[in-house]
């Protein structure tokens, strides 16, 4: 047997025990802890299987029926399924399922619709926006003239009057509605009105809340926007990747911007996993999971607004949530964001530190937390479980917390909802 054929048939554990051991350790971590990073989720086993198939071997530059390589008849079927399912799920006229990530999807939209130096208007990163919406250190802030709108200091909500005033002043070519850390629904009708008043195109980045949209629990931006981008993980719960939805008249530009504009060969194994995830997202089981996601976030926000939490300097930004995440302001707490993240990690809950508007601390420290419920809802958590998690978090962020007791409560919840049994 040749060395080549040996490597072709060996298992991961046989061929590379170091990587296999790290993968096993990560599976154990996911099983034994509570994942509450708002952008993370657990992909269905069928999604994992699709992504681990022989499709990883296939190059397929181009689009279904128009490839630059032979032997694409089967990947054409899969990619067309993904396209059709995305269009049906969100009511879109056009879908491109090839972007490798949400950032790549946003890049492709800019490449398709804008020229270097054009003006864009997006939510300030420090107020909950995203790097790709015009941050100065990101390509979007280097190549484009980025103007930022903000949330109001009084209530933490987007100031739509400011959005309108800035749009009239700067005449952006593209207005971006979307966020990475904002706990309320967006007023897409108002954004559309402002775009129409100023002759701008409207892009909605729904990466965080796409799953809620699919389940009918959040307004659908597709009827309002010229282009919608999203990731396929987060609340959608699929593989890590991107997706673009657009009006039909923009479809050719979008496709050309993705390939050959920004990418070469698409990742057909990931596109297959996207197709599977989009099928799941059209099911009642998925909608029920999203209802628990939303309910869990509201339960968490309610617990963290109780008097004992307030006395510990804990404040919920905007006073609550309409989505899958809660933003916690710790400016008046004994903890900064990094310390709070570490404390929760110590007891087995994974979250991420997050800047709050006008944060006095540096980005690697911050004064806040972003806490999400999608992964736990996928794991099967219901209202009673979320109430227990919320109380554990509240107790952990207060002075004099009992790490051992709280860790035991976390372990009990993890054991109650086993993850990937038999994997």
From Swiss-Prot:
Subcellular location: Cytoplasm
Enzyme class: transferase
Pathway of action: One-carbon metabolism; tetrahydrofolate interconversion; Amino-acid biosynthesis; glycine biosynthesis; glycine from L-serine: step 1/1
GO cellular component terms, A-Z: cytosol
InterPro entries: PyrdxlP-dep_Trfase, PyrdxlP-dep_Trfase_major, PyrdxlP-dep_Trfase_small, Ser_HO-MeTrfase, Ser_HO-MeTrfase-like, Ser_HO-MeTrfase_PLP_BS, SHMT-like_dom
EC number of this enzyme: 2.1.2.1
CC cofactor: pyridoxal 5'-phosphate
Any Gene Ontology biological process: tetrahydrofolate interconversion
Catalytic activity: (6R)-5,10-methylene-5,6,7,8-tetrahydrofolate + glycine + H2O = (6S)-5,6,7,8-tetrahydrofolate + L-serine
SUPFAM superfamilies, sorted: PLP-dependent transferases
Annotated positions binding (6S)-5,6,7,8-tetrahydrofolate: 125, 129-131, 249
CDD domains xrefs: SHMT
GO molecular function, one term: pyridoxal phosphate binding
Keywords: Amino-acid biosynthesis, Cytoplasm, One-carbon metabolism, Pyridoxal phosphate, Transferase
N6-(pyridoxal phosphate)lysine, modified sites: 234
Subunit structure: Homodimer.
Purpose: Catalyzes the reversible interconversion of serine and glycine with tetrahydrofolate (THF) serving as the one-carbon carrier. This reaction serves as the major source of one-carbon groups required for the biosynthesis of purines, thymidylate, methionine, and other important biomolecules. Also exhibits THF-independent aldolase activity toward beta-hydroxyamino acids, producing glycine and aldehydes, via a retro-aldol mechanism.
Family label: Belongs to the SHMT family.
Protein name: Serine hydroxymethyltransferase
Species of provenance: Thermobifida fusca (strain YX)
